[in-house]
Amino acid sequence: MAELGDYKINYEPLFGPLQLIDVGEAIKRADHPWYNQTLIEVGGVLLRLGVFAGGEYHWHKHQEQDEFFYVIDGRLRIELEGRDPVELAAGMAFSVPRGMLHRPVALEPTQVLMIEESGVAVTGD
């Protein structure tokens, strides 16, 4: 686990193969306003859970990896360098290509699933 300023990031997967993944129960474990938990690693890809009380993450980018966001509940705006922001509601998804400067903003309490390659620096490169 790492606490970086206003973020709590749990890199160790909460689940392994052949385990039932109860995302609702994982959400209940959130103990920080900007909480990030790796749920499982499958074939070199991470499924991560973000539970955000509201507010903004810092501007960052991932040089080598794309990032995928799926909103479970709430509203997430993804601000993108040189492009209009994208607003996501529950059931909506968006992918940010590698190398693009971006900043997620939780417009209200929001739960998000994120997919990234293993080894990603969650806070950006």
Model-based region annotation:
Residues 82-98:
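Short acidic-glycine-tyrosine-enriched beta hairpin
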Residues 1-48:
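A short, N-terminal "cap"/entry segment at the start of jelly-roll beta-barrel domains
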Residues 32-33, 46-63:
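Conserved short histidine dyad/triad with adjacent acidic residue
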